[in-house]
Amino acid sequence: MIAELLHWLATPISGASDHAIAMPLAWHGRLMVLAMGLLTPPLIIVARFFKVTPQQDWPRQLDNPFWFITHRRWGHIVGAIVAVAMAFVLAGRGWESPLHNVHTAAGWLVVLLVLVQLIGSWLRGTHGGPVDPFTRKPRPAALWPGDHYSMTRRRIIFEYMHKGAGYLLLVLTVLALCTGLIAADAPRWMPVALGAWWIMMAAVFVSLQRAGRCIDTYQAIWGLNPDLPGNRRRPIGFGIVRRPITNVSPRERASEK
């Protein structure tokens, strides 16, 4: 029974007797699976559910940088891996029209959205607020205005685009990976293992969402004061937890640092 199962897992998806693929295309597939199939789901989970960490005394302790540093650093790593993966496929096959087939179309859309995410993050505007995000020291009130703290139009557009593109990227990633595995006639253990990983990530997502861990970014950073610009408007996105507001001023928050 075990031997038969192992044989089935090692057999290509089509049932062919062997699996052969050109080396550049093999590395293209491996790197795209690593970047988009394995690394991207936990990065989204960290960004969505760990703006406040489990041991953090929130809202007394605000602006935990863990989620942002992790999301930004690993997001750039994912972008670099995708770039190398695309270099391999161009070296192996040369240029093909994005409309060549479903996999090619989905793959180029994934690359485009990765670029949108990276470029958008560079253009998101200034931070603002009563505490300098780099030195962690209080700032005078004259320096508080910023795109994020003041929720300017620039910041609002960024949030809609960044979050919307992120979830669209997930859908297209599933399509690109599935069609890529079929096109490569990959051994069956690959879609089985990748599917198990995504099911586990989906279970973690649902569990954290039901636990109320998707805390509003603005409140996670600047607290519950009802007078703050971001607390006077609805959060952008779905399933976001907005805690009851309290009368703690941003000046008091800055003085606690």
Question: What residues fall within each predicted segment?
Answer:
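Membrane-embedded alpha-helical bundles that constitute the cytochrome b-like, heme-associated redox core
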Residues: 2-257
